[in-house]
UniProtKB/Swiss-Prot annotation:
Signal peptide: none annotated. The gene is yqgI. One of its GO terms (molecular function) is phosphate transmembrane transporter activity. GO terms for biological process: phosphate ion transmembrane transport. One of its GO terms (cellular component) is plasma membrane. Its main location: membrane. This is Probable ABC transporter permease protein YqgI. It is found in: Cell membrane. SUPFAM superfamilies: MetI-like (SSF161098). Part of the binding-protein-dependent transport system YqgGHIJK. Probably responsible for the translocation of the substrate across the membrane. Belongs to the binding-protein-dependent transport system permease family. CysTW subfamily. Gene3D superfamilies: MetI-like (1.10.3720.10).
């Protein structure tokens, strides 16, 4: 077969695959938005949910989702980046290191329901905390930490060796080289990994069913003392997230407008993840320019 024809066929096949993937994503996104846009309003977002009466909102669930996301990433990012840097730069090249990498890959592929059961045993029953925000955040940290470690390790290893060798040749210590050369160069990839991990956290439901619970106590958004039982910042209270609320409304909800609430919540969930990802990518670019003086 003529080389030009073969090249055109291959290009066409790749383009077709890309078009199919794009069509699926656009179709799914459009379906969720179209079904939920009629429910979206300021009142819907700022009103607390209702267990029986129609017209409830998603205020508490939306706050819980972002709050658990914040706490989870507050734990995951330092540990994940530190672990990834160690695996890339300090860990010896031996069978123990290879075994650790294998364990990380296995842990990253565990179903979220398994992580939820582990969290139920460890952070709910064993600690005696019950269903709490911190229990859900720790379970999601177990869920996301292997991904963050692997992404950071790959990002550090992708930095050109010439940069590292030039820094070391000037007599700079390994730690200073990591801090001023490797990490700034790997920041875009690390930020991308953090974004992917954040998206998984924000949309997670199975693990949080067993750790953060299906209920949210009456919250007082004027009470910011984290030790108060009614404070939204209290990490030892149960917290139904938006993803869990959507599942709960669809399967166990008794409200007459359950379908509308679920559609509206799904639209908010998708839009929130999209906006968060765009903002995080912009932030990653700004940090990279600042650290590299570009």
């Amino acid at each position: 077969m003529n080389r030009k024809i073969t090249d055109k066929l291959a290009t066409g096949m790749f383009g077709l695959c890309a078009a199919i993937i794009a069509a699926i994503l656009v179709g799914l996104f459009s379906y969720i938005i179209i079904n939920g846009v009629s429910q979206l309003s300021f009142q819907f977002i700022t009103t607390k949910s209702s267990a029986i009466a129609a017209g409830g909102g998603i205020r508490d669930q939306l706050f819980n989702s972002f709050y658990i996301l914040f706490i989870t990433m507050l734990i995951t990012i330092p540990l994940g980046v530190g672990g990834g840097v160690f695996m890339a730069e300090y860990a010896p090249n031996n069978k123990v290191t290879d075994f650790i990498r294998t364990c990380i890959e296995v842990l990253s592929s565990l179903p979220s329901i398994v992580i939820g059961m582990f969290g139920l045993l460890m952070f709910v029953n064993l600690t005696g905390w019950g269903y709490t925000i911190i229990g859900g955040a720790l379970a999601l940290t177990v869920f996301n930490l292997p991904v963050m470690v692997r992404v950071t390790e790959d990002a550090i290893r992708s930095v050109p060796k010439d940069l590292k060798e030039a820094s070391l040749a000037l007599g700079v210590s390994r730690w200073h080289t990591v801090k001023t050369v490797l990490i700034p160069s790997a920041i875009p990839s690390i930020i991308t990994g953090a974004i992917l991990a954040s998206g998984r956290v924000f949309g997670e439901a199975a693990a949080l069913l067993f750790t953060a619970g299906l209920t949210t106590p009456r919250l007082n958004f004027t009470e910011w003392n984290p030790f108060s039982e009614t404070s939204p910042l209290n990490i030892f209270r149960p917290a139904e997230t938006l993803a869990v609320h959507i599942w709960n409304v669809n399967t166990q909800g008794m409200i007459p407008d359950a379908e509308a609430i679920a559609n509206g919540g799904s639209a908010v969930l998708v839009i929130s993840v999209l906006v968060f990802n765009l903002a995080a990518r912009w932030l990653g670019t700004m940090i990279y320019k600042k650290l590299t003086a570009n």
